[in-house]
Design a protein with these regions (language model features):
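Juxtamembrane transmembrane-helix termini in multi-pass membrane transport proteins
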Residues: 2-70, 122-142
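Hydrophobic/aromatic residues within the transmembrane alpha-helices of Major Facilitator Superfamily
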Residues: 12, 16, 49, 85, ...
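Alpha-helical transmembrane segments and their lipid-water interface positions
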Residues: 46, 50-58, 80-83, 117, ...
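Hydrophobic alpha-helical transmembrane segments in multi-pass integral membrane proteins
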Residues: 51-56, 112-124, 184-194
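Selective transmembrane alpha-helices of multi-pass membrane proteins
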Residues: 63-92, 153, 165-194
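Flexible cytoplasmic inter-helical loops of multi-pass small-molecule transporters
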Residues: 89-102
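Hydrophobic alpha-helical transmembrane segments of multi-pass membrane transport proteins
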Residues: 138-163
């Protein structure tokens, strides 16, 4: 049980550290509460998929094949650059309607970042807590704990971001905000690439 508590505490600390997921949640929560929450659900769905990949042992194949890792890294960066472009385009003077699915954005954001899977592969084995429970079950339990705390933290960040924007009464369609949101997508893309 000490291992599980240590895992929980370290997971909280890691999730709270400013990184691509937190930036993504903040950026998408500027739209409205619903958009932010859908992104959070999408990110956590991606975490479920990463956990299942580890539980079923596919992770070792992916870890040994750097072509797959590089593909996701470059595809992820291009996707985020695309989101930056869409952000600029939807707020231009032509007023082009862009259909957005914030849930899928969250799922894609999590799945295209190979660092998440590699992190799980490196992180989870350090917190195995039983000699009698199969490792795959332990990975599932650890993944569930990680997803649960991420859901709470990401949701809190989303709500706080949205409340802050409402409190300071910012025009989300102003050129400065649009460029800032696009810039954040580019920064997240570059972080995945590095």
């Amino acid at each position: 049980m000490d291992q599980i508590l240590l895992f929980f505490i370290s997971s909280l600390a890691l999730t709270l550290m400013p990184g691509p997921d937190i930036l993504f949640v903040i950026n998408q929560s500027l739209e409205d509460k619903k958009s932010g929450f859908l992104v959070v659900l999408g990110l956590c769905t991606g975490l479920v998929i990463h956990t299942l990949i580890i539980v079923f042992g596919v992770s070792s194949l992916i870890q040994q094949n750097y072509v797959i890792i590089d593909f996701f890294k470059y595809f992820g960066t291009l996707y985020l650059f695309y989101l930056a472009f869409i952000e600029l385009k939807k707020n231009n003077k032509l007023n082009i309607k862009v259909k957005e699915n914030f849930y899928l954005r969250g799922v894609y954001m999590n799945l295209i970042n190979p660092k998440v899977l590699l992190f799980f592969i490196a992180y989870f084995p350090n917190f195995l807590f039983s000699n009698t429970i199969p490792i795959s079950y332990q990975f599932f339990i650890l993944g569930s704990i990680f997803i649960g705390q991420a859901l709470v933290i990401f949701s809190s960040v989303s709500l706080a971001s949205n409340k802050l924007i409402l409190l300071i009464d910012v025009d989300l369609k102003s050129k400065k905000i649009v460029f800032l949101k696009s810039f954040i997508f580019i920064v997240i893309g570059l972080t995945i690439l590095i």
